[in-house]
């Protein structure tokens, strides 16, 4: 699929333009400068033509900190790989030194570029005061738009399609491929999610730095491993709600993480092995379990743990005790920074997904039920007649009982254990239960 990149200095309205073109609110939009830190992508469909649109972080001329420097590096690397660039400038303020520096880089890269003057609500004022100086950037006729007010976006789309077709790129809409395993990578800030994400993808796609809170937007990318397609989502670190100010960019990012979990098949929960398992780790794992997603637990930064060769059992016990409610999850010890056990993470994802999509025959369920009930005492008056699996993603079982009110948590634990021990282990997947009254 053709790739179109939106670039420009901070706060010229790139994310607003992105959201309007993809027709959904995916990139975070705020008045705060430099809100977009990671590239965000989606598909644009327009009159039967499709292309991938990528919203990049604002390019600072002279980045003053490590985050800004990393943002610039990621964006400039993506420019070199793009089919077309939308160079966005401020149609009210005109050009700045930052615009001129980026224009110089774009010209040297020889990438096809469309100059977009955003915030040009007043076209007469734009034509008179701003447009003449834009020609000095060297990209020909600028296209004035107002993303916020939906002005001239059709003209922009027509120009994009024309440019891409002139390059001989196939823009025909194709049926969406839904056989990919969707994987969300979640965890507290600075546990190494982005480093793990990049180790799996083996390229600098997500922004990685040692400063907590670097990733704000979910970043997703496709990868084929041994012929299998995955879509990985690297999500912003979840912090405790009490530590997140309302109406902040970070608050929006936390909502986006929950949304990423909702859309995932398998969630990789990343823990910092140097810090053990915290209350917030437990909250995140609980969120994944309640949403009914398959899960893999990763102790990252294993290379920094002292005497690690003798401590596998200790950390496994810690996992079983503190994350007992997802103890069905595969547990992997990694150093994403050094590339340790990345293949095992992939294997665990495959195992969890296989469990998540497995359906077992009713005969196996009821055979196990009869066998175990023969030596099990149920609460007085409770009878379990038979059961069957009614769904996958997650595996969901319906049991027919004489009294739903008598089915308490111990009986639910008993039935889940019965299924895992006697029918199918469902390693990596939660098991949901439903009950129906029957005589």
UniProtKB/Swiss-Prot annotation:
GO molecular function: GTP binding; ribosome binding
GO terms under biological process: ribosome biogenesis
Alphabetical UniProt keywords: GTP-binding, Nucleotide-binding, Repeat, Ribosome biogenesis
Keyword Nucleotidyltransferase tagged: no
Keyword GTP-binding: yes
Impact upon substituting residue 118 to D: 10% of GTPase activity remains
Pfam families linked to this entry: KH_dom-like, MMR_HSR1
Residues of the EngA-type G domain: 2-168, 181-357
Residues that, per the record, bind GTP 1: 8-15, 55-59, 118-121
Disulfide bridge map: none
Effect caused by changing residue 300 to D: Slight increase of GTPase activity
Domain KH-like: 358-439
PROSITE patterns associated with the record: G_ENGA
Entry binding sites for GTP 2: 190-194, 300-303, 336-337
Domain of life: Bacteria
Role played: GTPase that plays an essential role in the late steps of ribosome biogenesis. Has GTPase activity but no ATPase activity. GTP, GDP, and dGTP but not GMP, ATP, CTP, and UTP compete for GTP binding.
Sequence similarity: Belongs to the TRAFAC class TrmE-Era-EngA-EngB-Septin-like GTPase superfamily. EngA (Der) GTPase family.
HAMAP family: GTPase_Der (MF_00195)
Domain note: Each G (guanine nucleotide-binding) domain has activity on its own; domain 1 is twice as active as domain 2. The G domains do not interact, instead each contacts the C-terminal KH-like domain which lies between them.
Subunit-level organization: Associates with the 50S ribosomal subunit.
The protein, known as: GTPase Der
Upper taxonomic lineage: Bacteria, Thermotogati, Thermotogota, Thermotogae, Thermotogales
